[in-house]
């Protein structure tokens, strides 16, 4: 997650890795509990259809914070940013901001677990984007992995999927540049 939510699949078994782009960030948000259904209803009133990207991007952190602000009768500043919410949680210990990041991690983990069940990436599931490196401490706190593994009878299968956090925020851009370079080589060969 970053400004949006991108999803791709990589087949790295051959000599030349193949990348399959998707629009996976635009699948429907799938609430995991009653509280998340309330979040879905809240965002449905604002946006109509609610994709998972409405939660898992910078604006998504703000959306969750907005919902929790209304739920707990706190004033909501419509100008607040995801970075400010993260700072409130990480540096100032603000309980609403901390709860926002907990919700974000649970939703992120559940979505990643759904992707893992769909694609079975036994070589690893890689988390990238602008937000992931900024929330490494939150990733380590367990909410993400707990939600990732909360898949009923399929939970044991997901124990075989390693999850990696990529700290380089430019990895997507570097991959696109590499792809472009390879395409140029093929065109001139």
What are these regions (language model features)?
Residues 9, 34, 38-189:
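ATP-binding/phosphotransfer module of carbohydrate and carboxylate kinases, centering on a glycine-rich
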Residues 14-26:
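A short alpha->loop->secondary-structure connector
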Residues 4-11:
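Short beta-strand scaffold segments in enzyme catalytic cores
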Residues 1-4, 131-133:
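Short glycine-rich anion-binding loops that position phosphate/pyrophosphate groups of nucleotides
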């Amino acid at each position: 997650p970053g400004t949006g939510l991108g999803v791709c699949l990589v087949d790295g078994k051959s000599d030349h890795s193949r990348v399959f782009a998707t629009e996976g960030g635009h699948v429907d948000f799938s609430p995991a509990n009653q509280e998340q259904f309330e979040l879905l209803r809240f965002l449905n009133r604002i946006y109509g259809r609610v994709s998972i990207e409405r939660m898992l991007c910078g604006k998504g952190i703000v959306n969750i914070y907005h919902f929790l602000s209304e739920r707990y009768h706190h004033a909501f500043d419509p100008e607040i940013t995801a970075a400010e919410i993260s700072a409130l949680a990480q540096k100032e210990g603000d309980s609403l901001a901390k709860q926002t990041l907990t919700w974000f991690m649970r939703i992120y983990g559940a979505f990643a677990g759904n992707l893992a069940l769909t694609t079975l990436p036994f070589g690893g599931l890689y988390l990238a984007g602008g937000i992931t490196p900024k929330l490494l401490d939150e990733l380590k706190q367990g909410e993400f992995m707990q939600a990732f593994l909360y898949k009923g009878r399929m939970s044991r299968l997901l124990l075989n999927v390693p999850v990696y956090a990529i700290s380089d925020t430019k990895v997507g851009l570097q991959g696109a540049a590499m792809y472009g370079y390879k395409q140029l080589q093929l065109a001139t060969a």
